[in-house]
Amino acid sequence: MSFISSDDSDFRWIDDYSQGKIQLGLGTGDPKFDEFFRYKKEFLIINGHSNVGKTTTALYLIANSAVQHGWKWVIYSSENRTASVKMSLMQFAMDKKVADMTYSERKEAYSWVQEHFTVINNEQVYSYADIILFMEKVMRQQDIDAIFIDPYNSLKLDMKGTNIGVHDYHYEAASEFLTFSKANDIAVWLNCHSGTEAQRRKGPDGLPVAPYAEDTEGGGKFVNRADCFVTIHRKVQSADPNIRKMSEIHVRKVREVETGGAPTPLEDPYCLIMNLSHTGFTTRIGQRALFQPINFLEQAQMPMNINFLG
């Protein structure tokens, strides 16, 4: 009966785990961050308030995965110009503004983006089913490690021919993304807005506090389906300019802790600080970037063959 799990396969996994043979998720470049978050081929949901830099922080983490691990991504960002998304990735890769790059550097950085990222045009509004269909088409043409959908809330509600309500539709969408991730061994990152009530909640300093997972617009159905859940928050109206530059990363849920990662302490998130040029982040502790910027011109220089000199 095919619906029953394989005892042999399950025992093999348990035996491998007991011997420390289960591979951990891929590292971030910072051992402290690795305690809470690792790159895995799983269904990850991000939430946060509007205008706190969710997309920017996520794109930096995405660029990090491409630089350090060679991950290849499909990106659908409906609220940002596709050229702007590519430019951000170029700048993160080189830690340099495009205006400060030479023409050759811009060409090399853009080629790197083309190699690692497929960006879906956002001239139309798509449903979650459309996005899955696009993914299947891209995967038939090339290897893909992950997809970033930004934001989920902008996707079209396509409920034609169904007898379900909006709540069930969103639950079905989350379930479909989870199933797609597992069936294809691919990471699915879903960026979501927080609900209105959560945006009204203030801390002792009078500033909005980070939303919880259940504060996601649409409710707790999203955290229920997610393998990993992350909240990105920034105090954009703080009087302290250093606080305004700091992105808090709250890891709310890690389903499979056996492969690395764990929820961050409630009042002590992991933090990244935007650099002065807005082309990268550094860690709060140690003030170091997660990865070394790529020097495309240095890579392009081939060593001279001097064997002919005898």
Which positions does each model-derived feature cover?
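C-terminal regions of RecA-like/P-loop NTPase motor modules
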Residues: 2-12, 18, 107-110, 128-144, ...
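Signature of the SF2 helicase/ATPase Hel1-core->accessory helical subdomain module
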Residues: 154, 193-196
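The Walker A/P-loop phosphate-binding site
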Residues: 2-95, 306-309
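Hydrophobic/aromatic beta-strand patches that form the interior of the parallel beta-sheet core
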Residues: 44-46, 74-76, 118-120, 189, ...
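Structural recognition of the conserved hydrophobic beta-strand(s) that form the central parallel beta-sheet
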Residues: 75, 148-149, 186-193
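Conserved inter-motif catalytic segment of the P-loop NTP-binding fold
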Residues: 28, 69-167, 172, 297, ...
